[in-house]
């Protein structure tokens, strides 16, 4: 049934009426004592919204078999779900947040015992509200599942996880809600994933608020948010192209101090088909805006890790891999925010970049197995960071190396150095011994597919000596160990019956053209039974392969793509059919010989010192000529110190045979001898040195010398899919990332200003004492405003909000955020409070705000202070009341 134009026009009117009613309820004081008013309002609203959703779906059923997908309107259903969260549930959660903060703040301000009674009252009402929200979204899912047979649109794993199979047969045959079946080619099929994704996303966010509100302490761990992360995981499987899911997951990891995986999720949130503006702002607050509390705290955390590393004896491996990497990444991605203006080779906090680099790569090579996921996340950040740099450009037309700027080439140098260490220190050393660790070869698959999908990256990789060497050595090692009797390098693209975990990790990300392309199996999998489950890595048990079998498939894909990437390299690495391995030019020989010769010379010097130390003492400091001659003759002719004819002589003794070495041996300088064997064959030695020891300020190659199109044949390996993900709107957002401020809520659409009653400047009497608590406290600079459906949520600002368990003196020094709050209508963000600057980045008071020790020394090593205002708030805005 198609709704009339009047019905369509009534929807915005109904929305405005609902917002006006909720505005009146929250403005009153009744909610503190009586929950019945809100409960009745929610029952009415949920009934209306449920009916509107079902009506909208029914109105589209007639179009479900239409050939023109553009004629199918799913915006009305999405707008209803968005309205339910943004204009109804979210403001109420924010109201409970302010109530909780008032209770905790009053406790700290008056130095009274914890007000468990008031907190219990608040928590009881909040839990009732949460259950109402949970039931609403679950009922939407259940109703749609009962009314329509959508088994062809959703994986069975998701149906089982949501326990939908329990209600599968509850619909009567003669019921008006008879089951209707449609296939995956129906336009309506595009609506179901969107509807389920919205519901799962909002359920996960509601659980996150529940976790934040029900704890009397602001200390949280990942385990506290398990339910939320489970829903976000399901939402990403249903609709991987939506960046909001990763933004919300990143907010949780930000709240719990897991900065590496938080940035990882923010990068994913920016690289999807539907980028999240919240991810852009949070990424900017962490990595770009050095005036934000998050960026300052990250600098302090890196310093704490450095102090802990210096103290010893235990090396904080996870902290080094996580925080040192972020420091290096920031110093290359946004040098002006991270590097010292006068000393560009060190961070703002004084730590030298070379130390961070050495410690990071040394830890990677020695402690990778226990931290493989962190290294994997860093790889995604590294790859995504390059494309984020391109999106910051005013023009998005860069196609070749000649179009790149110096900072972008420097970033590629950093990225490929990190990749080369992964290939050399992790993959080559451990792939054969750890088949159960899928991340080892999974990283190589992502690296190869990223290079394959991006022509300018391919151009750079083929001239990057360190990367070409590392990839060739890895392929040689795989071929040499021959993981199976039939294993070989072929042009045949392998096939699978289901996707692997790394496929899901980058599914929907633009830098790999939205899926990995080293297997030719997508169409084949779609024709199989349980195809949707296979595409989320959950095949039937009969088709599930062992870890070793999966490793063989990954190896075949890695070898095939790698051999194509190495075909047109400019580093002289060539495949030898006779030797069945890659051989290296003299430049590689020069590099390896110098290293080996220096090592041999050092060992020889140490051996000579040891011989002198162990030399037997002589009687009275003398030795007979006969004994001396005997010792000289018995010494080896291969010694680096040549045998002399007699004591004091500088002439070597005559050799016993004519089997002698070149004259270089006479001087004992083995390095020179080895260098004589080298033929440079016209290679540029300067270029070799540049690639042997690249620095941050240098590109690995000169772009002007590496962009000869005739040297690259991309047709054999480039993906046929063109990159269309650099939308101008997103590029514009990235251009201003330096000016972005932290924000933690997903903005589905711009909210129109609410029509109707506004809050008046009144306050519940129970909170009136708070007005004068900090009347003269300073406020941070104003932030760009985000319009909310209710005025009391439109108060925004940026600054540090200390944890509630901080010391009273420290708390009061930072309590500007709670001064003169009006919790029913807080209008305390005036111009007179927007003039003070943020506190010093490394002030002692700021460091003391950290809650938990990273290690044993409580006084020195402190955990990241994810303040209450923080960039972890959910789903809308950057309010000063966003206490989480």
UniProtKB/Swiss-Prot annotation:
| Presence of keyword Cytoplasm | yes
Where does this protein chiefly localize?
Answer: nucleus
Which ranges form a coiled coil?
A: none
One Gene Ontology CC term in the entry: P-body
Swiss-Prot/TrEMBL keywords: Chromosome, Cytoplasm, Nonsense-mediated mRNA decay, Nucleus, Telomere
Sequence intervals crossing the membrane: none
Entries under Gene3D superfamilies matching the protein: Tetratricopeptide repeat domain (1.25.40.10)
- Disulfide bonds, which pairs? none
User: Quick one: where's region Disordered?
Assistant: 596-645, 755-774
Biased composition (Polar residues) is annotated at 633-645
Biased segments, Low complexity type: 760-772
Task: Tell me a Gene Ontology molecular-function term this record carries.
Answer: telomerase RNA binding
Q: Which InterPro entries match?
A: DNA/RNA-bd_Est1-type, Est1-like_N, Est1/Ebs1-like, TPR-like_helical_dom_sf
Knockout: what is the outcome?
A: Results in stabilization of NMD targets.
A Pfam family annotated for this chain is EST1_DNA_bind
Q: Which GO terms describe its biological process?
A: DNA recombination; negative regulation of translation; nuclear-transcribed mRNA catabolic process, nonsense-mediated decay
Give the location in the cell.
Nucleus; Chromosome, Telomere; Cytoplasm, P-body
Q: What does this protein do?
A: Plays a role in nonsense-mediated mRNA decay (NMD). Recruits UPF1 to cytoplasmic mRNA decay bodies (P-bodies). Negative regulator of gene expression. Inhibits translation most likely through effects on eIF-4E (CDC33). Involved in telomere maintenance.
Per the similarity annotation, which family is this?
A: Belongs to the EST1 family.
On assembly, the entry states:
Interacts with NMD helicase UPF1. Interacts with CDC33.
Query: Which protein is depicted?
Result: Nonsense-mediated mRNA decay factor EBS1
């Amino acid at each position: 049934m198609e709704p009339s134009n009047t019905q369509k026009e009534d929807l915005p009117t109904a929305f405005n009426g609902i917002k006006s009613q909720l505005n009146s309820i929250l403005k009153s004081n009744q909610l503190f004592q009586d929950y019945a008013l809100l409960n009745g309002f929610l029952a009415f609203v949920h009934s209306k919204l449920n009916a509107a959703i079902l009506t909208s779906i029914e109105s589209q059923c007639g179009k479900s078999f239409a050939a023109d997908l553009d004629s199918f309107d799913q915006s009305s259903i999405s707008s209803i779900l968005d309205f339910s969260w943004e204009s109804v549930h979210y403001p109420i959660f924010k109201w409970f947040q302010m109530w909780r903060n008032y209770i905790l703040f009053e406790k700290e301000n008056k130095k009274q015992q914890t007000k468990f009674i008031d907190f219990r009252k608040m928590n009881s009402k909040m839990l009732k509200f949460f259950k109402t929200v949970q039931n609403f979204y679950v009922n939407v899912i259940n109703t749609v599942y009962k009314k329509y047979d959508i088994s062809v649109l959703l994986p069975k794993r998701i149906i089982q996880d949501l326990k939908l199979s329990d209600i599968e047969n509850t619909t009567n045959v003669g019921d008006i809600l008879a089951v209707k079946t449609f296939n995956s080619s129906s336009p309506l099929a595009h609506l179901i994933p969107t509807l389920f994704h919205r519901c799962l996303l909002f359920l996960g966010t509601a659980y996150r608020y529940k976790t934040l509100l029900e704890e009397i302490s602001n200390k949280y761990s990942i385990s506290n948010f398990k339910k939320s992360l489970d829903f976000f995981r399901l939402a990403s499987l249903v609709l991987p192209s939506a960046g909001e899911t990763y933004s919300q997951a990143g907010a949780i990891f930000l709240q719990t101090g897991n900065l590496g995986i938080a940035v990882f999720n923010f990068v994913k949130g920016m690289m999807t088909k539907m980028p999240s503006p919240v991810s852009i702002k949070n990424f900017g607050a962490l990595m770009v805006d050095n005036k934000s509390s998050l960026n300052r705290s990250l600098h302090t955390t890196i310093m704490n890790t450095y102090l802990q590393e210096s103290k010893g004896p235990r090396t904080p491996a996870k902290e080094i891999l996580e925080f040192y990497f972020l420091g290096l990444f920031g110093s290359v991605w946004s040098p002006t925010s991270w590097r010292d203006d006068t000393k560009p080779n060190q961070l703002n906090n004084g730590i030298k970049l070379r130390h961070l680099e050495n410690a990071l790569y040394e830890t990677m090579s020695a402690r990778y197995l226990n931290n493989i996921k962190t290294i994997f996340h860093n790889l995604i950040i590294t790859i995504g960071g390059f494309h984020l740099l391109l999106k910051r450009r005013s023009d998005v037309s860069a196609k070749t190396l000649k179009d790149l700027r110096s900072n972008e080439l420097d970033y590629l140098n950093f990225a490929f150095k990190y990749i080369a260490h992964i290939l050399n220190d992790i993959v080559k050393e451990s792939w054969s011994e750890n088949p159960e660790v899928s991340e080892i070869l999974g990283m190589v698959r992502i690296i190869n597919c990223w290079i394959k999908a991006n022509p300018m990256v391919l151009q750079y990789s083929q001239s990057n000596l360190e990367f070409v060497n590392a990839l060739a050595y890895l392929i040689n090692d795989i071929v040499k160990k021959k993981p199976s009797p039939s294993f070989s390098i072929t042009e045949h693209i392998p096939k699978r019956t289901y996707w692997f975990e790394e496929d899901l990790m980058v599914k929907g990300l633009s830098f790999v053209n939205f899926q990995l392309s080293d297997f030719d199996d997508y169409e084949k999998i779609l024709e199989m039974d349980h195809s949707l489950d296979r595409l989320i890595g959950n095949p039937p048990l009969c088709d599930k392969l062992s870890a070793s079998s999966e490793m063989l498939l990954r190896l075949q894909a890695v070898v095939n793509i790698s051999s194509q990437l190495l075909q047109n390299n400019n580093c002289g690495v060539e495949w030898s059919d006779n030797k069945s391995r890659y051989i290296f030019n003299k430049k590689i020989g020069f590099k390896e010989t110098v290293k080996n010769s220096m090592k041999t010379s050092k060992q020889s010097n140490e051996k000579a010192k040891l011989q002198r130390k162990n030399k037997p003492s002589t009687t009275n400091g003398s030795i007979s000529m006969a004994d001396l001659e005997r010792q000289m003759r018995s010494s080896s002719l291969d010694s680096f110190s040549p045998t002399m004819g007699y004591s004091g002589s500088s002439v070597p003794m005559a050799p016993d045979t004519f089997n002698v070495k070149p004259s270089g041996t006479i001087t004992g300088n083995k390095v020179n001898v080895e260098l004589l064997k080298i033929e440079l064959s016209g290679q540029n030695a300067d270029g070799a040195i540049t690639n042997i020891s690249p620095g941050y300020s240098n590109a690995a190659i000169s772009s002007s010398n590496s962009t000869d199109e005739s040297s690259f044949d991309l047709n054999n390996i480039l993906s046929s899919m063109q990159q269309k993900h650099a939308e101008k709107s997103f590029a514009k957002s990235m251009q201003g990332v330096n000016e972005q401020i932290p924000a933690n809520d997903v903005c589905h659409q711009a909210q129109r200003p609410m029509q109707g009653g506004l809050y008046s400047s009144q306050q519940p009497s129970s909170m009136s004492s708070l007005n004068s608590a900090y009347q003269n406290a300073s406020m941070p600079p104003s932030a760009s405003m985000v319009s909310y459906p209710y005025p009391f949520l439109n108060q925004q600002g940026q600054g540090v909000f200390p944890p509630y368990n901080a010391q009273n003196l420290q708390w009061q020094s930072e309590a500007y955020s709670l001064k003169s709050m009006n919790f029913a209508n807080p209008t305390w963000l005036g111009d007179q409070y927007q003039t003070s600057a943020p506190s010093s980045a490394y002030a002692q008071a700021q460091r003391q705000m950290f809650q938990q020790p990273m290690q044993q020394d409580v006084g020195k090593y402190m955990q990241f202070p994810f303040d209450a205002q923080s960039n972890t708030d959910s789903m809308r805005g950057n309010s000063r009341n966003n206490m989480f």
